[in-house]
UniProtKB/Swiss-Prot annotation:
Expressed in heart, muscle, testis, ovary, uterus and prostate. Coiled coil: none annotated. InterPro entries: WD40/YVTN_repeat-like_dom_sf (IPR015943), WD40_repeat_dom_sf (IPR036322), WD40_rpt (IPR001680), WD_repeat_protein (IPR053053). This is WD repeat-containing protein 25. PROSITE patterns: WD_REPEATS_2 (PS50082), WD_REPEATS_REGION (PS50294). Gene3D superfamilies: YVTN repeat-like/Quinoprotein amine dehydrogenase (2.130.10.10). It comes from Homo sapiens (Human). Residues 17-74, 183-208 are annotated as: Disordered. Residues 30-39 have a biased composition (Polar residues). WD repeats lie at residues 244-286, 290-329, 330-373, 375-420, 424-463, 469-510, 513-544.
């Protein structure tokens, strides 16, 4: 190389250095002359940080440079790092300080002919390549964080902690979590359960744990067992508020054995039915998850040691409480909505649902004994009359010519229709209830009133007494008579609980029971002032 060439290169370098010192604008954004201003000290939106993978490089990038050289062919310098910054994203070594101003960095407007390592990976803050790659590994969205890192980081930020906590988060230091706590957290994450949710029992198809039904009698029930039933008093206060179901509660029933009547059975749309101690403690004694779909109906066996359940999964189960085993399992041809035991032969029960027929099952053989067919689509409720030789069924027929199908009286032995001209109004009857002393029964109607009928043929409806004031609005709102027969109780679609005088049909009391529709009400068979109610919101209340 000649001496003239060397002198020319030296003059160019000197001219470039003097020009860069004379300039006052910082690098970072382009002006009209193609220069770039430094915006590293300006707060960037989260989407424009280097962690998001977006670089502040101009559309007209630099020419490809030679590796190992400090200057590009056009006489422009490479981007330099601002070493004096101590905020997030600067050079990791804080001991190095830049003595003066930042040197200006300019870029040519011409498009690069090929991709360059420097132009494609220069971060917005102009840090060295090693620091940029280190930051990219830690904060880039393209590299997912581990679950423990994400958890520790969220906890640290949520506490607004000290710099030590932030440094701990940045360095990925995760505290040790015992195995027992990790398993509990994993279980709560998978099932979505909280601390206040009741256990839901074993998975469907498995036998539940045995429920010990001791020989003792509740101290609240014992004084009333050997005495005559007193007049029913109107409850005013809530004794227990039972929560545990994750879906609407369909039905509730007290245990029919008086000495064990502290137990309450509830069915729900969450595929379970539960047994509660609703008199002494208000705790859930056992949860049964035998069904794969909603449990629409369940009944205590008259012995008080077994529960018959049926649901939308077409399955029927008879469960022994003391052993937890299934004494009977059957499969119906339709979704089940109502079940009733025969009042005399406790090995026989009736089953109705989304079908035009009802079926009588024998538990001893596990087979269908008899079928009762009508031109309907669904059976809403079944009610046995005294001695069990006759029973009533309410259906969903509500057309103009449905006077022969709304309520039907059947002969149990011959499966013949005794009468089908019982209810002549264009309303369906979602529930039926028998009076304990008088030869009458009640029918809940979608006309927002309770109708009174005779239990003796021809089953005439009373025109003088009609119990009005509540709302049904399509819900399966239940109704019942008190054990003494002097009061009637019904739920309402607006959550209220209403009581009527049986003799005068006047309203005796109104309770603001639930926030959603109250669909079930039942008096305690022994305690004269205890009432249980359930709602479509999944909760139950014990009134006293």
């Amino acid at each position: 190389m000649t001496a003239r060439t060397l002198s020319l290169m030296a003059s160019l370098v000197a001219y470039d250095d003097s020009d860069s010192e004379a300039e006052t604008e910082h690098a970072g954004s382009f002006n009209a002359t193609g220069q770039q201003k430094d915006t590293s000290g300006v707060a960037r939106p989260p989407g424009q940080d280097f962690a998001s993978g977006t670089l502040d490089v101009p559309k007209a990038g630099a020419q490809p440079t030679k590796h190992g050289s400090c200057e590009d062919p056009g006489g422009y310098r490479l981007p330099l790092a601002q070493l004096g910054r101590s905020d997030w994203g600067s050079c990791p070594s804080q001991r190095l300080q830049w003595p003066g101003k930042e040197p200006q960095v300019t870029f040519p407007i011409k498009e690069p002919s090929c991709s360059s390592l420097w132009t494609s990976h220069v971060p917005a803050s102009h840090m060295p390549l090693a620091a940029a790659r280190f930051k990219q590994v830690k904060l880039s969205r393209n590299f997912p964080k581990s679950s423990f890192h994400a958890q520790s980081e969220s906890e640290t930020v949520g506490k607004n902690g000290s710099s030590f906590q932030k440094k701990k988060c940045e360095d990925c230091v995760v505290p040790y979590t015992p195995r027992r706590l990790r398993q509990r957290q994993a279980l709560s994450t998978e099932t979505g359960k909280g601390k206040d949710v009741e256990p839901q029992g074993p998975p469907a198809g498995r036998a539940p744990a045995p429920l010990y039904v001791g020989p003792g009698v509740s101290e609240f029930i014992q004084p009333y067992l050997n005495s005559h039933y007193k007049e029913t008093t109107v409850p005013r206060k809530v004794l227990f508020h039972l929560r545990g179901h994750r879906g609407p509660v369909n039905t509730i029933q007290w245990c029919p054995v008086l000495s064990k009547s502290h137990m309450l059975l509830s069915t729900s749309m969450d595929k379970t039915f539960k047994v509660w101690n609703a008199v002494d403690s208000g705790h859930c004694l056992q949860t049964y998850s035998l069904h794969t779909e909603a449990v629409r109906a369940a009944r205590w066996a008259p012995c008080g040691r077994r529960i018959l359940s049926g649901g939308f999964d077409f399955a029927l189960h008879l469960t022994d409480l003391e052993t937890g085993t299934q004494l009977f399992s059957g499969r119906s041809d339709f979704r089940i909505t109502t079940l009733k035991f025969h009042p005399k032969d406790h090995n026989i029960f009736l089953c109705g649902g989304f079908s035009s027929e009802m079926k009588a099952w024998d538990i001893r053989t596990g087979k269908v004994m008899r079928s009762y067919k009508a031109t309907i689509q669904q059976t809403l409720d079944i009610l046995f009359l005294r001695e069990g030789s006759e029973f009533l069924s309410s259906t969903d027929a509500s057309t103009r010519d449905s006077a022969d199908r709304t309520i039907i009286a059947w002969d149990f032995r011959t499966s013949a229709k005794i009468s089908n001209q019982i209810f002549h109004e264009r309303f369906t009857c979602p529930s039926l209830a028998l009076h304990p002393r008088e030869p009458v029964f009640l029918a809940q109607t979608n006309g927002n009133y309770l109708a009174l009928f005779s239990t003796v043929w021809p089953y005439r409806m009373s025109r003088r007494r009609r119990y009005e004031g509540h709302k049904v609005e399509g819900y399966s709102v239940g109704c019942e008579c008190s054990p003494g027969g002097d009061l009637l109780v019904t739920g309402s679609a607006d959550g209220r609980v209403l009581m009527y005088s049986f003799r005068t049909a006047s309203r005796a009391c109104t309770l603001q029971g639930h926030t959603q529709a109250c669909v079930g009400t039942t008096y305690h068979p022994v305690l004269p002032s205890v009432l249980a109610t359930c709602s479509w919101g999944g909760d139950m209340k014990i009134w006293h």
